[in-house]
Amino acid sequence: MAWKMMDGYEMVIGLEVHVELKTKTKIFCACPTTFGAAPNTQCCPVCMGFPGTLPVLNRQVVHYAVLAGLATGCTIARYSKQDRKNYFYPDLPKAYQISQYDLPLCVGGHLTVETEAGEKRIGITRIHIEEDAGKLVHDPEKGTLIDCNRCGVPLIEIVSEPDIRTPQEAVAYLHKLKAVIEYTGVSDCRMQEGSLRCDVNLSIHKKDEPFGTRTEMKNLNSFTSVQRAIEEEYRRQVEAIKKGEAIVQETRRFDQTTGKTSSMRRKENANDYRYFPDPDLAPIVLSDEVIAGWRKELPQLPDVRKAAYMADYGLTAYAAEQLVSSKYLADYFETAAQSTTAVKMLANLMISEVFRLLDGEDAKIPLNPAALAKIADMTEQSLISVGTAKKTIDALWNTPEDPEEYVTRMGLMQISDEAVLAEYVCKAIDTHPEMVAGYRKGKLTLKNALMGVAMGLSGGKANPVVLQKLMDAALDA
């Protein structure tokens, strides 16, 4: 169900997206970043903050952060620094997080997203590097346990401008951002593994009035959760204001089971974290030559591929947008397109059928690209119907059988022989004279009924275009 404005209250949304970088080691030490390792087996005195240890910045983290900044149109700072963000929480052994406060690495970017009203430009305030905290594991028998493997895993935090006005725009922005980051190769963006997490800042106000007090919902790990959390928090704030209650600046938790948000703690301000430059880390200084060299590494990004698909293959903006929504899907499409001239049909089958069969945002396609290309060719050449193409994709999804051999073996080839189809048309007309008479008296919908009879006589294998032509000729004779 689409979101609807309540009582004239507009929402104002800003997103903070945390992306785990795909480095082999952590941001300030040599510990590995492998996902799923046994608890507390990938940490050392440096990432645990033991006295006397010194951090050493991983150059690859800066490299990847700059690539993300360049891909989102940011200005790259020639001089930036790292700061300590001080707070106490069980998953933060050092009692401070190394982040960036007033001099981030990247500033002033944007993404353009497709909305129901057309294209919309959403600003990106900044991208900065920081280290991740550990993870609390809640066990009903043992209580809350702490896994420090994630401490020191490198992150970039991508902070949007408060330009988003609907849940749908928020999800569109996240889809676009995820695609851009995947294309650069700096992260796998696997939300189910926590390598892309989203915090939502939301306030409401009436048009031409000042923005309201914002609340924050943290660590949302799916696009569906983001949309549901926004819709629910908007509803809660509107109802609270209508009751005369004040909106408190706080952090709230979204419960996926109940679909409700609940208060976690009062929201801190920057001063509460007592930021100061980390005395153990030198400033990050980048030359124009280094940045120019990294810029050359940028791959072809989604918007460029989208424009190419529209120009080269004649695809619609919608179809092209769907295909470039993931680098994996775009690569698969391009590989399949090399084996067929029926590229539009290929795109249609991917969007309507392949996407339907994918299990989750990060699922892979087991069907060989060349096999899908052959199915597109057979459909374009009217050897099989679109319905048969869909059945064939379903049947061969996890098997290596050749599509043409499968269709032949199952007797699914479409009948286009006019002599054969003419017999079905004649039989349909001869056995239903009342429909023919009704059609000729002006009940034109009866032609569709006769088409259905003839199609049934063919076992559903008749080429509908040829069958339609023959039926028209017979009825108008």
Q: Which role does the model predict for each range below?
A:
Residues 2-300, 311, 317, 338-342:
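Basic, nucleic-acid-interacting segments
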Residues 193-206, 310-334, 343-360, 396-399, ...:
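Core structural elements
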Residues 290-297, 304, 334-339, 372-384:
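Extended, non-catalytic structural segments that build the interaction scaffolds
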Residues 319, 332, 342-350, 371, ...:
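Residue-level detector of well-ordered alpha-helical segments, enriched
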Residues 325-340, 354-358, 369-375, 428-438:
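Short amphipathic alpha-helical segments and their helix-coil junctions
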Residues 363-373, 377, 383-457:
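Strongly charged, low-complexity linkers/loops
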Residues 425, 465, 469-477:
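A carboxyl-terminal module marker
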Residues 457-464:
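Short, basic interhelical loop/turn and adjoining N-cap
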